[in-house]
C-alpha cells in the first residue's frame, strides 16, 4: 500500500483559509492548531502556514489584551486579489509604455547608423586590397626576389583598412552590450532590429591572414601597384 502524500504548502494554506471562511470567526493560534488537523494540516505546521497567509495579507491579525487573534473573510481575499490585479495591470501598462519608448529609441539608433558607412567603405576597401594583394602574389611568383619595402607598404595599407573595419565592429558590439544592459526586457525586439540592420549571429571581427614578405628586386612593379590602389 502506497504511503499517503502530504499536503503541499499551498494546499495547507487553502485548508486553513477554509476554516476562516466557513466560520467567519476570530481564532487564537492555539485554537487553529487544534482545528488544523481536522482539515489535514498537522498542528506543528499551522503556525508557519498562518504566518505565510498573514504575510500575503490573506489573513489579518490583531492583539487584544495579551492575546493575538486571527481572522479572514472571503471579502478580504477578494479585495486583496483585486488590489494585486490592479497593481499588475499598472505594472503592465508601465512596462508597455517603457517598451514603446525602447522601440522608438532602437528605431532612432538604427536610423543613426549612417556613421557606420565608414565601416562599410573600409570593408570595401579591404576587399579590394585583398584582391589586389592576391593578384600581386600570383604575379610575383614569376620573380625570384621581391622588394621587402614595397611589400611592407602593402601590408601596412591592408592593416590600416583591417583596423578601421574592426574598430567599427567593436563600436557595434559596444552599442549592443549597452542596449542589453539597459533594456534587458526588450531582448527579442533588439535582436529583430539587429537582424534588420544586417547584424546576424555570424557577425564578428575580420581576421586577416598573414602577409608574407618577399625579397624581390622588382620594386618598381610593386610600387606601381601600391600607387594604383591609392
Swiss-Prot record:
Gene Ontology CC entries for this record: nucleolus
Coiled-coil portions: 79-146
Keyword Nucleus: yes
Main subcellular location: nucleus
GO biological process, any: embryo sac development
Disruption phenotype: Female and male sterility due to production of defective gametes.
Subcellular location per the Swiss-Prot or TrEMBL entry: Nucleus; Nucleus, Nucleolus
Assembly with partners or alone: Interacts with HOP2, RAD51, LIM15 and MIP1.
Job description of the protein: Required for proper homologous chromosome pairing and efficient cross-over and intragenic recombination during meiosis. Stimulates both DMC1/LIM15- and RAD51-mediated homologous strand assimilation, which is required for the resolution of meiotic double-strand breaks.
Protein name: Meiotic nuclear division protein 1 homolog
Amino acid at each position: 500500500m502506497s504511503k499517503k502524500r502530504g499536503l503541499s504548502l499551498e494546499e495547507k494554506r487553502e485548508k486553513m483559509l477554509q476554516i476562516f471562511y466557513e466560520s467567519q470567526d476570530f481564532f487564537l493560534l492555539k485554537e487553529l492548531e487544534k482545528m488544523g488537523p481536522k482539515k489535514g494540516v498537522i498542528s506543528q505546521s499551522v503556525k508557519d502556514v498562518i504566518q505565510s497567509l498573514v504575510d500575503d495579507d490573506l489573513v489579518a491579525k490583531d492583539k487584544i489584551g495579551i492575546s493575538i487573534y486571527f481572522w479572514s473573510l472571503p471579502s478580504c481575499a477578494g479585495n486583496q486579489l483585486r488590489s494585486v490585479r490592479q497593481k499588475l495591470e499598472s505594472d503592465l501598462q508601465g512596462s508597455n509604455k517603457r517598451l514603446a519608448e525602447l522601440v522608438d529609441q532602437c528605431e532612432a539608433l538604427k536610423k543613426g547608423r549612417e556613421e557606420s558607412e565608414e565601416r562599410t567603405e573600409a570593408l570595401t576597401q579591404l576587399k579590394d586590397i585583398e584582391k589586389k594583394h592576391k593578384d600581386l602574389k600570383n604575379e610575383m611568383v614569376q620573380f625570384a626576389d621581391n622588394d621587402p619595402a614595397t611589400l611592407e607598404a602593402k601590408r601596412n595599407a591592408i592593416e590600416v583598412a583591417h583596423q578601421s573595419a574592426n574598430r567599427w565592429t567593436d563600436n557595434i558590439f559596444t552599442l549592443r552590450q549597452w542596449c542589453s544592459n539597459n533594456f534587458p526586457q526588450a531582448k527579442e525586439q533588439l535582436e529583430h532590429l539587429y537582424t534588420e540592420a544586417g547584424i546576424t549571429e555570424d557577425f564578428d571581427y575580420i581576421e586577416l591572414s598573414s602577409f608574407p614578405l618577399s625579397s624581390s628586386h622588382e620594386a618598381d612593379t610593386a610600387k606601381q601597384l601600391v600607387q594604383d590602389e591609392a
